[in-house]
Every structure is written in C-alpha cells, then in structure tokens.
UniProtKB/Swiss-Prot annotation:
This is UPF0227 protein YcfP. InterPro entries: AB_hydrolase_fold, UPF0227, UPF0227/Esterase_YqiA. NCBIfam families: PRK04940.1. Pfam families: UPF0227. Belongs to the UPF0227 family. Gene3D superfamilies: alpha/beta hydrolase. It comes from Escherichia fergusonii (strain ATCC 35469 / DSM 13698 / CCUG 18766 / IAM 14443 / JCM 21226 / LMG 7866 / NBRC 102419 / NCTC 12128 / CDC 0568-73).
Length: 180
C-alpha cells in the first residue's frame, strides 16, 4: 500500500497522474485529501486517516508519499505512524512561505516545536528525498542542506516543483519500499 498526500494545490490534475504512476509499484495507492489551510486540523485528520488505513492494511511494507506541502506531512505522519516515507520537493518551511495562502501559517512552526525532539535523527534512513534542481517554488538546496544528514537525497534534473513525472524514480522508490 502507498498512501499519497497531495501538495497545496489539491485540485491539480497532476495528483491523479502521480497516483497512476505509483500504481506501477503497488496497485493499492490511496489518496488522502486534506484542507491545506488549517495545519493543526490537517495534522489531526491525516493522523486519523493514515492510522485507519494502516489498521485495515495487509501490506507489511506500506509507504507514505507526498509532494510539496504533502511532503512536509508525509515525513511527519510517516514518522509518527512508523512507516517509510518518500517526499518530492518537500515544503520544509511552510510557516515562512505560506503567508497569505493559508489562515494560520504560524501553526506550522507550533507543530514543529511540538513534534518529537530530533525526530529526523530518530527517523534516519526511513525517508527518501527527491528534489528538483528546477523547483520554481522552493529552494531545493536549502532542503538538501537541511535533510542530507538524515536521508538519502536524489536529484532530478528535469522536473519543476509539482513533479509531474515521477516515473524515472519508480524503481528507486520500489527498492526503498521493499526495504520496509
């Protein structure tokens, strides 16, 4: 089972495309939708939905995957639910760059302080990070600098922020999932 979390643009047709691409790894891909506008509510909702899916799950190596803001959530929810994560261009600093787009961007900073201390150290090697060199929305190098101590970083030379085509990375993701 692969759980997919969309980014800020929840209505993007690219979400359906990524789900279809992920089905080459596992036919059981589940999209969880969330508001993107209310961080504390989103965290509660995502934890509840992922936990529900894991309770009914028969796959002993589930994976959670997210793009952009979905990558922010996939890393945290995956850690809290003890499943491996794959994140594409994760928005690591939504409290800085979501100003004017969501109601309370400061809630992201609050969530970060309430998360487990040094959670990335405890999550070491359980998250695969795929970054685009042509991300027009976020500073990929800043993300790499933040994450490379804990996770493997894979650089993509073609895609932009929304990462329309993930197919060149499917074999790597599949191998990462099987490590479980």
């Amino acid at each position: 089972m692969i759980i997919y979390l969309h980014g800020f643009d929840s209505n993007s047709p690219g979400n359906h495309e990524k789900v279809l691409q992920l089905q080459f790894i596992d036919p059981d891909v589940r999209l969880i939708s969330y508001s993107t506008r209310h961080p504390k509510h989103d965290m509660q909702h995502l934890l509840k939905e992922v936990d529900k899916m894991l309770q009914l799950n028969v796959d002993d190596r589930p994976l959670i995957c997210g793009v952009g803001l979905g990558g922010y959530w996939a890393e945290r929810i995956g850690f809290l639910c003890d499943i491996r994560q794959v994140v594409f261009n994760p928005n690591l600093f939504p409290y800085e760059n979501m100003e004017g787009k969501i109601d309370r961007p400061e809630e992201y900073a609050d969530i970060a302080t309430k998360c487990v201390t040094n959670f990335r150290e405890k999550n070491r090697d359980r998250c695969l990070v795929i970054l685009s060199r042509h991300d027009e929305a976020l500073n990929s190098q800043r993300s790499a600098d933040e994450l490379h101590h804990f996770y493997e970083i894979v650089w993509d030379e073609e895609q932009t922020h929304k990462f329309k085509n993930i197919s060149p990375h499917l074999q790597r993701i599949k191998a990462f999932k099987t490590l479980g």
